[in-house]
Amino acid sequence: MKIAVLLPFLALAGVVSAQTDALTPLNVRQVKVRGEIGRRIDITIHNNLMVLDADKDFLRPFEVRDQKGGYIGLGKLILAAVRFAAYSNEPNVTALKDRLVTRLIATQEPDGYIGICARGSRMNTLWDVHEMGYLIAGLLSDYEFFGKRESMAAARKAADYMIGHWSEIPAGWGEQTGVATHVAVTGIERTMLALSRVSGDAKYREFVVKQRALAEWSLPIVIGRRPGIEGHIYAYTARSLAQLELYRTDPQPGLLTQPDGIIDFLTRRGGMAITGATGQWEIWTDDQDGRGQLGETCATAYQIRLYDSLLRLRGDARFGDLLERTIFNTLFAAQSPDGRRIRYYSPFEGPREYHPGDTYCCPCNYRRIVAELPELIYYRSGSGVAVNLYTASDAKFDVNGVPLSIRQETAFPSSGDVTVQISPEHPTRFPVRLRIPAWASGTRVSVNGAAASEASSGSFFEIDRQWRSGDTIRLTMPMQVRLVQGRKRQSGRAALMRGPLVFCLNPAQEKSLANIDGADLGRFTIDPSSLEAVQDDSVRPGGIACRVGVWRPGYPTSDKPDLVLRFGEFADPGGLATYFRLRDLRVAVNDELIH
């Protein structure tokens, strides 16, 4: 047996050949997810997707087609429904998907237009092109996952309409609407590249390369909300993702400038909050402001897609760490614990609000990204397999032509103990690579009870051996509660973390705190010697909380804290505060994801 540590690959532009990704995701049909990630998938299907009023809220506007602009998000809903149907294999989910697609195609006009706008308002009003682009993507996904030729035909017809009418977008559209063109048509380049790849028709790629000049797009990250909202995180990240897709077939180093710039901004320049969220009011910010409109859910979804794309391209465990932090904190905080309601923003200080409806960008992008989570757990890695996310799950696929089953058992993120059972159909040699999170210093790995080896954090740990059915890998990742120093606006305070989880204070547990604002709660002082992880099912079954002794605002001199409180997981919908004072800030550590 050969055991090695894979150091993170250099994240430099032009290092990786465009022809070969380091990692390849599995299909959603090959993975079944349990644990908290699986629970979120299930409640999003059954408590959200399946209880929507799809006829009234989503389909009716496309059948009437009398609007002068606006946005519904039906294409995003179809994208989610297609993946959920493929993943769950539940007849009622597939029936909903079929109904959405069939009814949508029935609204397509002879010239190919598909949307909600009346004649005279098509292509030239917000957000008609944006809506149409995702409708094309949804129809294309129905063809990819279910082989529906009518969906492919409708997708191509709509794409041809868009290309043929592109000149109808006014030259001064950005000035007229206050929204830059690349923001107003968010998602179209990635859709057209996918349509070209699946259909084999080069004209859709040519539209992206020539008409949209994707390779020439080079916009620095803009701080603040300026005319044209050029600093729109979702739009910027979506176009950067399209550049990564173009890079895979046309490896121009400049195509990596924007994607790498996002990572640099998030991890080196103050752009990312401790929860993984970024931006205020949908726009890039770097001051660590945690109130109000932090972390638009669309931006969160596209951060996750960017991390996944870079992880696949380079195989750097760092991107898996970013995925883990963002998913377990900001993403899951954007949904009510029962799954029914979704947030537009997920601040770490002050009250959080749910979006009032089921349509529009954030609710629909939330469903989409949750439907993609099964593809972020396991990857093909050369001749072997890589385990990226830890959650109870099962996967079945071939490795080197040999059928393989993987079963992962763990209570993660409540526990750092993980078992991964490897069962090839017959004895086969291949490498298994395990992502060791940057927070998991002192991780031990063993196979079949043999002496454990220590694995370096922040890297992939490789075990290359002949595997037999039932062979079991055991990981033990230490999960001490740690205090993490705040930055910029949060300087002089610290947040509590354990593993990938960030903790927050819900004041409802203590009457004397009921009317205190989140900012004032942050003036409480934590007793580092009191920190204790305890089970807490208030946010999720088998969840975790941290019992903490705190002193009220002032200059505490007594050894005994004034109160003992429970700090819950960041997904706690009543959480109002995340950063707190310390008597001695030297007990806090730096955030391991910030460089």
Residue ranges: model-predicted function:
Residues 21-30, 85-98, 142-156, 195-209, ...:
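Structural helix-adjacent loops and short alpha-helical linkers that scaffold large soluble proteins
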Residues 69-86, 126-143, 180-197, 231-248, ...:
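Well-ordered alpha-helical segments within folded domains of soluble proteins
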Residues 208, 259, 320-329, 334-421, ...:
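C-terminal beta-rich recognition modules with glycine/proline-rich loops and embedded aromatic residues
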